């Protein structure tokens, strides 16, 4: 079968390989991927900055954002059936008894990222208990479930932490970044009734800006210093340390900032001491969140259905580029105007 692979730690080793078709073990299923989404993590792996091949393999099959059909059941599987359309979660625990999305590094593997082959192939295998069934009416956009699950968990964590202190009911939110995570954060928070302001670098006539406004949110294409006022909740989705610190300035007393970006090492942060002192004196909370479990995938699908009802084809317009396996290199190229690129693998019969 064909699979999109890299040799981890070797920059620009991306290639399409012919590899053996996998077989499901006990508790596993064989999947026939329909499509996979591509994100910044894939870019880092291709650049040799991250990633690990499974034991005994020189290469790693990419693809952690997947929509697939159940093709074959291994022994002991009774929660899904052949023909079900599903999305798989990403992480699998090793020697960790915590919810898998809270396991520390070294105690888990991740499909298409770390120690476990992904789904950018004609077939893949995964553990059945980490599959979430997709309703027929959401199949066209369900490839977005994985990034949406990250948003769902991040917002859930922020609300849980904020509400553990007193009855905290955020009314306003600042979203930093308008990539898939920033836009999906805006969508979820608008569905929850919050007033949102989304800040990014694209011009006000860009697709990203229009998508924000179509949700009823405010879009700002300038520096954070031009924004007045404070916000109960801040979602940081840029991966810029300076933007994160500047966002803290706009966090209201008793507010919560959730970090969904991944930050580069080093660098000098302007006025960090004053910003942190202000955070202490005003009981501001800063919390990081990564990955997601089954419950947040399920919540994401429920919000997808609600978004379709309220915002029409909004979700489908996040997919700005599609490519096939035979043209896989096009899928793994990036421009500033791309939002979500999808690799089409198998047709849905």
From Swiss-Prot:
Enumerate the cofactors the protein uses. Zn(2+)
- Say if the entry is tagged with keyword Oxidoreductase: yes
The reactions it catalyses are: D-glucose + NAD(+) = D-glucono-1,5-lactone + NADH + H(+); D-glucose + NADP(+) = D-glucono-1,5-lactone + NADPH + H(+)
Binding sites annotated in the UniProt record for substrate: 41, 110, 146, 291
Q: Which GO terms describe its biological process?
A: non-phosphorylated glucose catabolic process
Molecular function via GO: D-glucose binding; glucose 1-dehydrogenase (NAD+) activity; glucose 1-dehydrogenase (NADP+) activity; NAD+ binding; NADP+ binding; zinc ion binding
List positions binding NADP(+): 178-181, 260-262, 289-291
Query: Keywords assigned by UniProt?
Result: Carbohydrate metabolism, Metal-binding, NAD, NADP, Nucleotide-binding, Oxidoreductase, Zinc
Q: Which domain of life is it from?
A: Archaea
Residues spanning the signal sequence: none
Outline what the protein does.
Catalyzes the NAD(P)(+)-dependent oxidation of D-glucose to D-gluconate via gluconolactone. Can utilize both NAD(+) and NADP(+) as electron acceptor. Is involved in the degradation of glucose through a non-phosphorylative variant of the Entner-Doudoroff pathway.
Task: From the Swiss-Prot or TrEMBL record, give the protein name.
Answer: Glucose 1-dehydrogenase 1
């Amino acid at each position: 079968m064909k699979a999109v692979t890299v040799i981890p730690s070797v920059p620009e080793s991306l290639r399409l390989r012919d590899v053996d078709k996998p077989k499901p073990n006990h508790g596993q299923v064989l999947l026939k991927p329909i499509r996979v989404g591509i994100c910044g993590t894939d870019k880092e792996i291709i650049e040799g900055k991250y990633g690990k091949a499974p034991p005994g393999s020189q290469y790693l099959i990419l693809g952690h954002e997947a929509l697939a059909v159940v093709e074959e059941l291994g022994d002991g599987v009774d929660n899904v059936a052949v023909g079900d359309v599903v999305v798989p979660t990403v992480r699998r625990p090793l020697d960790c008894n915590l919810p898998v999305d809270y396991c520390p590094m070294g105690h888990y593997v991740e499909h298409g990222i770390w120690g476990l082959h992904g789904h950018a192939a004609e077939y893949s295998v995964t553990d059945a208990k980490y599959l979430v069934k997709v309703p027929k009416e959401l199949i066209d956009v369900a490839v977005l479930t994985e990034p949406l699950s990250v948003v769902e968990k991040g917002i859930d964590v922020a609300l849980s932490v904020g509400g553990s202190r007193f009855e905290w009911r955020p009314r306003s939110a600042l979203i930093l970044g308008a990539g898939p995570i920033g836009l999906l954060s805006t969508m979820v928070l608008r569905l929850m009734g919050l007033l949102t302001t989304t800040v990014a670098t694209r011009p006000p006539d860009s697709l990203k800006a229009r998508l924000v406004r179509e949700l009823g949110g405010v879009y700002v294409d300038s520096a954070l210093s031009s924004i007045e006022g404070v916000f109960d909740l801040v979602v940081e989705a840029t991966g810029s340390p300076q933007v994160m610190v500047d966002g803290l300035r706009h966090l209201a007393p008793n507010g919560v900032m959730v970090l969904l970006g991944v930050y580069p090492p080093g660098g000098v942060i302007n006025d960090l001491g004053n910003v942190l002192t202000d955070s202490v004196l005003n009981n501001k909370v800063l919390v990081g969140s990564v990955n997601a479990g089954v419950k947040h995938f399920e919540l994401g699908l429920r919000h997808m259905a609600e978004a379709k009802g309220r915002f029409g084809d909004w979700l489908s317009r996040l997919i700005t580029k599609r490519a096939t396996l035979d043209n896989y290199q096009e899928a793994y190229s990036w421009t500033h105007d791309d939002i979500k690129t999808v690799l089409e693998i198998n047709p849905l019969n």
